[in-house]
Swiss-Prot record:
Protein name: Small ribosomal subunit protein uS13
Gene3D superfamilies reported for this sequence: 1.10.8.50, 30s ribosomal protein s13, domain 2
Pfam families, per database record: Ribosomal_S13
Native source species: Methylococcus capsulatus (strain ATCC 33009 / NCIMB 11132 / Bath)
Alphabetized UniProt keyword annotations: Ribonucleoprotein, Ribosomal protein, RNA-binding, rRNA-binding, tRNA-binding
GO MF term set: rRNA binding; structural constituent of ribosome; tRNA binding
NCBIfam families linked: uS13_bact (TIGR03631)
GO CC term, one of those recorded: cytosol
Family: Belongs to the universal ribosomal protein uS13 family.
Renumbered residue ranges of the record's region Disordered: 91-118
One GO term of the biological process aspect: translation
Keyword Ribosomal protein attributed: yes
Amino acid sequence: MARIAGVNIPDHKHVLISLTAIYGIGRTRAGLICKNAGIETDKKVRELSDEQVERLRGEVAKFVVEGDLRREVAMNIKRLMDLGSYRGMRHRRGLPVRGQRTRTNARTRKGPRRPIKK
């Protein structure tokens, strides 16, 4: 099992799919990484040589992925909350941020219903 960006990527899958196991890399970016590293996307990870895995590591290192990306996203949300912007207030209150309706639905963001006490 190859280890790239601190993640064990599955070796029984194609390189394109295996790279998506890394947080911050989707199929499009995985394809771009394979192209820049000069590796066919339909090759399985276990078929790659050590030199090819090193080239993949070098290409992945050019992007912000895993812990750094998670930290960056968390800091962006914290910044919005500290500014007191509308989006920050919605994050703080645990409500939908992107304009969805809340009169009905939005249960995922709001959590389970609380009964009204009389």
